[in-house]
Amino acid sequence: MVKFSKQFEGQLVPEWKDAFVDYWQLKKDIKRLQAAEAEAAGVAATTPLSQCQAPVAAAHWVMRLPFLHPHGHHHKEHGAIQVHRKLASGGGGGGGAVAGEVYETELVDGGAGFADGEAARAFFARLDEQLNKVNRFYERKEAEFVERGESLRRQLQILAELRAAVVAEQQRDGRRRRCGNGGDSSPPDTEDPSVSCSILHGDQSLRGTSEQEQEGQEKLTKDMIARSPDEGDDDQLTIPQELGDSGRLGRPREEAANTRPRTTLPGGRAVTCQGRSVRINIPVTTPTRTVTAIRELLFDDMLSQSRRSGSANGTKCGDKLSINKRKVHQAEKMIRGALIELYKGLGYLKTYRSLNMMAFVKILKKFDKVTAKEAQSIYLKVVESSYFNVSDKVIRLMDDVDELFVRHFAEGDKRKAMKYLKPNQREESHTTTFFIGLFTGGFAALFIGYCIMAHIAGMYTQQSNKVYMATSYPVLSMFSLFFLHLFLYGCNIFMWRKTRINYTFIFEFTPTKELKYRDVFLICTTSMTIVIGVMFAHLTLIVKGYSSCAVQAIPGALLLVFLLILVCPFNILYRSCRYHFLTVIRNIILTPFYKVVMVDFFMADQLCSQVPLLRSLEYLACYYITSSYKTQDYGYCTRVKHFRDLAYAVSFLPYYWRAMQCARRWFDEGDINHIVNLGKYVSAMLAAGTKVAYENDNSAGWLSLVVIVSSLATIYQLYWDFVKDWGLLQFNSKNPWLRNDLILKQKYIYFLSMGLNLILRLAWLQTVIHPNIGSLDSRVTLFILAALEVIRRGHWNFYRLENEHLNNAGKFRAVKVVPLPFHEVEED
């Protein structure tokens, strides 16, 4: 049977761990009480009883005999504690649960009935503290979610009105076209069917907007790291205009407008439609939206100039804004994503309530068992009547969100709605584990055979077959580096899950489509078995003297097959994961035009450790595209100048992409740390460039430049690794030279990890000292050093996400903050 402490830790929301009942500390307090009770019992047993004490003690022990209590419970003293309820402001508490109440427990008779009265007082003081903490957190989160629910209800109302206006405009456009075809002199409207609304300019749209509201909305926009799920524009949803008449989600729009001011986003355009002034804000996350935003900005400038000139001439200028169906659909997806996140947060809060209630029950039961006092029934009545347990707002709000989502985003289909609101986790199959073992054995056997044959043929020595090492070996090394990296990612997933690091939330993975660590291991073992099998067969043909074009093309064909599998459109071989990978790569390549999220710059960091792989890929593409494999002219791609210059570009690209991501994040968030981080990647680009230049010109000048630039870049990178990415080396931390919060219990592991990262960061020294391992070919030595860099990156990944997870936990951030598209404004 699983202990409750394990069950509690496994089910709590990781980012809210500090807000849960500190069950483990309360258990320590009970152990101190237990030790005091045992000590008191030992003293009582060794003390001789007086004549007057003996009958009382005898009666006491007789009453504790099991057969006198048919239910097996010892006699417990009643009324050991009294719990006082009062308002936080100091006023007295009422009979029911009131938000802002605090609880304080008093021991009857000053704790004289306990073996250690001080320990008992400390226990109940901590228990009161935990109950008050749970109530405060629950109240705060509940209010936050209720306010979010009210905002979403108003968003849906605005969306319904805009959709109705779009439909009405389409109908009017159709009638105009029919009239035009029937001989009407007015020209038909050739623009995209849209709703025309008057523009409310910035000087007219804001009235009395407080500075605090603007800062809050700016923070909401900056904290948003989530993107709406990509869907086609054909997914049109029907939303009736009479929304929310029967729902309980929030107050009516008029009442809400009268009781709290409307917030607006700084900038953007406001439109007046259906008697409502609305500012529309679609986040600029893609190149298309970037171009659209620039176009609208220029259009605004022209309209402003036209408006000023019209006012000067005494004429009235009617400004119009076209809100097409595409923009309405984008707003619809944003609202749907916000509803999903709200439902998820409400589910977390529901779990928070049930787990904390169970923790109070368990800990009080332990207390009664240790002290033989009847405190559980008294204190549990207080817990059961406290705010976090009696408030039903979360349950009602979940029902409302469920109802709204089913009605407006699932066409009335409850099952379809639950696929979004409560996605089922994929069950892990034992078949996957079986095939992992099967392919691991196959890979081991083939790899041993390949190594034996390569050793006999002397392929990897300095006097080896130059053609094979220049053309075929890069294919094997490239696959090895890639799948080694993927294997380490599987190890990262295993460790993140074991330590309860919520990587799926950090990376914004879909729970039903994410790769589990067993899936990653299966992909690695299967792929490497195929690769090593094909390369073993190819090496066998080479050793036997076959050197035709078909034989030389085998490594290239293998690479082509894997590339085709990567882009395969059929729903096989983890298509959703393959396409997500390609999407992330696309976002990295087009970095300045896409909003940068965690998974994008995390993947770009991985590419920075795979520069040898990218250079091998560039060389192989040149070798096979130029048909050099037919003549076995492996030196062609290194002799031609533009291919040689391309090697510089490939060495720079990962660092350039990462630097552009830093620039985009600085542009979006305004944090100067992103500019400092950009400098780190610029130094890495300079170091990579000097290394490539030194490889082409082995002069003392280039060697000196390599040492100087690489040393400075390494110091820069180490500082950023330890202080920024890992959050370590905090001098004022309660854990010296580390940080306040640590997930791993053994502190020495962090110091060992910093030392290992330092050693592996010095791999660039191979450029200077040219190490030779026996008679091995230099390409093999470079592969070993490249593998060490991949291992360093896999090791770095764990601590990078640990720090990110702790940042989320420090802010109690367990759900994404999706920005809302519509912002109501008031006009003068």
From Swiss-Prot:
Annotated function: May transport inorganic phosphate (Pi).
Membrane topology recorded in Swiss-Prot or TrEMBL: Multi-pass membrane protein
Database matches in PANTHER family: PHOSPHATE TRANSPORTER PHO1
Membrane topology, Cytoplasmic segments: 1-433, 496-522, 574-699, 770-828
Family: Belongs to the SYG1 (TC 2.A.94) family.
Key words of the record: Cell membrane, Membrane, Phosphate transport, Transmembrane, Transmembrane helix, Transport
Induction (free text): By Pi deficiency in roots and shoots.
Gene behind the chain: PHO1-3
Record has Translocase as a keyword: no
Tissue-specific expression: Expressed in roots, leaf blades and flowers.
GO biological process: cellular response to phosphate starvation; phosphate ion transport
Protein name: Phosphate transporter PHO1-3
Region described as Disordered: spans on this chain: 169-268
Localization per Swiss-Prot or TrEMBL: Cell membrane
InterPro entries per the UniProt record, alphabetical: EXS_C, PHO1, PHO1_SPX, SPX_dom
Transmembrane intervals: 434-454, 475-495, 523-543, 553-573, 700-720, 749-769
The SPX domain, residue ranges: 2-381
Database matches in Pfam families: EXS, SPX
Molecular function per GO: inositol hexakisphosphate binding; phosphate transmembrane transporter activity
Domain EXS positions: 638-828
